[in-house]
Amino acid sequence: MGARIAYLAAGIAVAAWLAALFGCAGGGTFNSGERAPWRQQAEDECVASGAVQASAYVVQMTPIDGPGVCGLERPLKVSGLSGGAVAVSPPALIGCPLTAALDRWVDASLQPAAKRYFGSRVVEITQIASYGCRGRNGNNFGKISEHAFGNALDIAAFRLANGQHITVVNGWWGGPPRERAFLQAIFAGACNE
C-alpha cells in the first residue's frame, strides 16, 4: 500500500512538472462545452512547424473525439524520442506539442544531466500515464487533467546505457544525492520548455 501511494505521489509530481512543458491551462467538466480553440491551434501550429515527424517511433493514430471535451485531432503513438535514441515504454499516446517539447527536453536537459551525474545516456523512459479522459489526480469531479488532451505524461523511471535504473519515487524522496540532483535538474529543465 505504501509503495502504491508513493508511486501515485511520484506520478502526480511528475505530471505537474511535465505540465510546465506546454503551459497547461483550464479545467472544466468532461461533458460540458467544447474544447478550447487554442488546443487545436497549438496542434495545427506544431504539425505545420515540422517539429515532429512521423517515423517508426512516432505514429499518427486516428482522431479521438470524446467523451465530452476529451480528445485529440492528431494523437501520436510515441515509442521513442530524440529520433528513437530514447525509448518510451510503454508507448505513449500524446499530442504533437507535448511530443515536440519532450524531444527538446530530452536533448537540452535530460541527456546533459544524465551525462553530468552518471556519465551515461538515458536510453529508456518508463511512463505510467499518457492520454486518458480523466480528472486531475484521478478525480473525475474536479478539473479535467491535461491527460484528457494528450498534453501530459507521467514518468516513473529512466534507464541509462550503463544499466542503471532511476525511479522517480525512490530517487526524488530519499535516493542517493546524485539521483536527487539528476531528477531536480531535469525537473528544472522541464520548466524551461
Where are these regions (language model features)?
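Second-shell loop/turn segments in exported
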Residues: 31-32, 91-101, 141, 168-177
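Active-site acidic/histidine clusters and adjacent loop/turn architecture
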Residues: 45-126
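Catalytic cores and adjacent binding grooves of peptidoglycan-active enzymes
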Residues: 25, 29, 144, 151-193
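Bacterial Sec signal peptide processing site at the extreme N-terminus
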Residues: 18-42
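Stable alpha-helical elements in mature extracytoplasmic
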Residues: 38, 42, 98, 102, ...
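A mature extracytoplasmic/lumenal domain signature
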Residues: 80-82, 127-131, 157-159, 170-172
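Active-site-adjacent substructure of cysteine-protease-like catalytic cores
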Residues: 116-150
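Sec-dependent bacterial lipoprotein signal peptides
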Residues: 1-24
